[in-house]
Structures are given as structure tokens and as C-alpha cells.
Regions:
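Hydrophobic transmembrane signal anchors and adjacent membrane-proximal interface regions, especially
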Residues: 2, 28, 55-57, 97-99, ...
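Sec-dependent signal peptide recognition
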Residues: 2-9
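N-terminal cleavable signal peptides for secretion/export
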Residues: 17-63, 68-71, 78-94
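Solvent-exposed helix/loop surface patches that form functional interfaces
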Residues: 85, 89-152
Length: 152
């Protein structure tokens, strides 16, 4: 019986990290011949999203990374890079968020809600099958608060 308890405890400790490791590459092609590539990766403790959009004579790369908990991704860094130069960024600490266009300088606000960029929000929804009831979205340039209404 003691061996069974030890094996069961080991299995329970292993399962949450075993199912959580994912590495997806997605290619999107439109009628406008502008391919986009998105790479989603999560290993149980960290996640990253890297999106590349190839517009003729103009390349855009969105990157996001952060930690991973049992119920949500926690973004710590987001960058919008255009033609190899940083355009907009968001930096998240436990108590503040800095964001803005690089050329205009960054604004700092208290961090009051979970924060996602659009790609991390999509990854959160597909990976965990839910979003927090209130959160905020950033594109690096600004922040928009979101409140979800739940049906009763």
C-alpha cells in the first residue's frame, strides 16, 4: 500500500508538467500574398509567442513571453518590432506596467489586472479554454481594460 501511495504521488506530481509542454508553429496565408507565421511555446513554467508578418518591403515581428501557472499565462514582456527596429514595448513587473512607443518614451501605471497581448490572449484561450473575468490587452502602445460578462 505504501508503494502505491508513493507511485500515485509521483504520478500526480508529473502529470501537470507532462501535459503542459506544447510547441506549435502556424503559417497563415492570405489572398494578399502576405504570409504570417506564429510560434506558440509553453513548457509548464514559461511561455513565449513569436509572430512574424511579412508585408512586402516591411517586416513586423511581435514577441511575448512570460511565466505559466496552472490557470493562466502571466506576460512579463511584449515587443512590436518593425523592420528590425523596436516600435512599441510593454514591460510588466509584479506591481507596474511600462508601455508605449519607443520613440515617445514609456508610460508607467500600477498593474491591477492580468495583461495579455492579442497573441497571448489567443494562446490563453486555446490552451486553458478560459480567460480571466477581467484583464487588460496591450499592443505595446496602449492598454485597454476588458471585462467579460458571464451568462447566468
Amino acid at each position: 500500500m505504501k508503494l502505491f501511495k508513493i507511485l500515485f504521488a509521483a504520478l500526480i506530481a508529473y502529470v501537470p508538467t507532462a501535459w503542459s509542454a506544447v510547441d506549435y508553429n502556424i503559417k497563415y496565408s492570405s489572398n494578399y500574398l502576405m504570409p504570417a507565421y506564429v510560434h506558440f511555446k509553453a513548457d509548464g513554467s514559461q511561455y513565449s509567442v513569436n509572430a512574424k508578418i511579412n508585408i512586402p518591403l516591411y517586416n513586423i515581428v511581435f514577441t511575448s513571453r512570460g511565466s505559466q501557472t496552472a490557470s493562466q499565462f502571466k506576460m512579463v514582456n511584449y515587443q512590436d518590432v518593425r523592420n528590425g527596429k523596436p516600435y512599441a514595448i510593454s514591460k510588466i513587473s509584479p506591481t507596474t506596467i511600462e508601455y508605449g512607443k519607443v520613440k515617445n518614451g514609456l508610460e508607467t501605471e500600477p498593474l491591477t489586472l492580468p495583461t495579455f497581448d492579442l497573441f497571448t490572449m489567443a494562446f490563453q484561450l486555446s490552451y486553458y479554454d478560459k480567460l480571466p473575468t477581467s484583464f487588460q490587452i496591450t499592443n505595446g502602445k496602449k492598454i485597454q481594460k476588458v471585462l467579460l460578462y458571464q451568462a447566468r
